[in-house]
C-alpha cells in the first residue's frame, strides 16, 4: 500500500513539475521577446544617433528622403538642421538642439543596455530553474524505472 501512495505522490510531483516547466517556458519566451524588442530599439537609436551626428555638421537647406511608412518615401528639404523633434515618450514630442537630441539618444541606449542586462540575467536564472525541474523529472523517471 505504501507503494501506491509513493506512486501517487510521484505522479502528483510530476504533474506539478510539468506545470512549472510550462510556466517557465512561457516566461522564457516572453523575456526573449522583450530582449529582442530592446535590441531592435537599441539598434534604431544608434542609427538615429549616427544620422544626427552627420546632420549636425550641415548648414543651410539639406535635401533628404523622408520615410512615410509602408515602404514609401518622398524627397524633402530640411531647412533647420540645428533643431530636431524628439519623441520623449507618451506621445509627447519636443524640439531640441541636435546635441541635446544626441545626448538624449545616448541616455536611452544606456537605459536599454541596463534593461537588456537585467533581462539576460533573468533569462539565466530562469534557465537554471528549468534545468532543476528537468533534472528532478529525470530523477523521478529513473526511480520509477528501477522499481
UniProtKB/Swiss-Prot annotation:
Name recorded for this polypeptide: Prefoldin subunit alpha
GO molecular function: unfolded protein binding
Recorded family membership: Belongs to the prefoldin alpha subunit family.
GO cellular component, one term: prefoldin complex
Range of residues in the leader sequence: none
Transmembrane segments: none
Quaternary structure, from the entry: Heterohexamer of two alpha and four beta subunits.
Keyword Hydrolase: no
Record's subcellular location: Cytoplasm
SUPFAM superfamilies listed in its UniProt record: Prefoldin (SSF46579)
GN (gene name): pfdA
InterPro entries listed in its UniProt record: PFD_alpha_archaea (IPR011599), Prefoldin (IPR009053), Prefoldin_subunit_alpha (IPR004127)
Species name: Methanocorpusculum labreanum (strain ATCC 43576 / DSM 4855 / Z)
Pfam families per UniProt: Prefoldin
Keyword annotations of the record: Chaperone, Cytoplasm
Phylogenetic placement of the source organism: Archaea, Methanobacteriati, Methanobacteriota, Stenosarchaea group, Methanomicrobia
GO biological processes: protein folding
Taxonomic superkingdom: Archaea
Functional note: Molecular chaperone capable of stabilizing a range of proteins. Seems to fulfill an ATP-independent, HSP70-like function in archaeal de novo protein folding.
Amino acid at each position: 500500500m505504501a507503494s501506491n501512495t509513493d506512486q501517487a505522490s510521484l505522479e502528483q510531483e510530476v504533474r506539478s513539475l510539468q506545470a512549472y516547466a510550462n510556466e517557465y517556458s512561457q516566461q522564457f519566451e516572453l523575456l526573449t521577446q522583450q530582449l529582442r524588442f530592446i535590441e531592435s530599439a537599441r539598434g534604431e537609436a544608434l542609427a538615429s544617433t549616427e544620422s544626427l551626428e552627420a546632420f549636425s555638421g550641415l548648414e543651410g537647406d539639406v535635401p533628404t528622403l523622408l520615410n512615410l511608412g509602408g515602404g514609401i518615401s518622398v524627397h524633402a528639404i530640411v531647412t533647420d538642421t540645428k533643431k530636431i523633434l524628439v519623441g520623449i515618450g507618451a506621445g509627447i514630442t519636443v524640439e531640441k538642439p541636435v546635441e541635446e537630441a544626441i545626448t538624449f539618444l545616448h541616455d536611452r541606449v544606456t537605459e536599454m543596455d541596463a534593461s537588456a542586462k537585467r533581462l539576460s540575467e533573468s533569462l539565466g536564472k530562469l534557465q537554471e530553474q528549468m534545468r532543476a525541474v528537468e533534472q528532478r523529472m529525470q530523477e523521478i523517471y529513473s526511480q520509477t524505472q528501477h522499481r
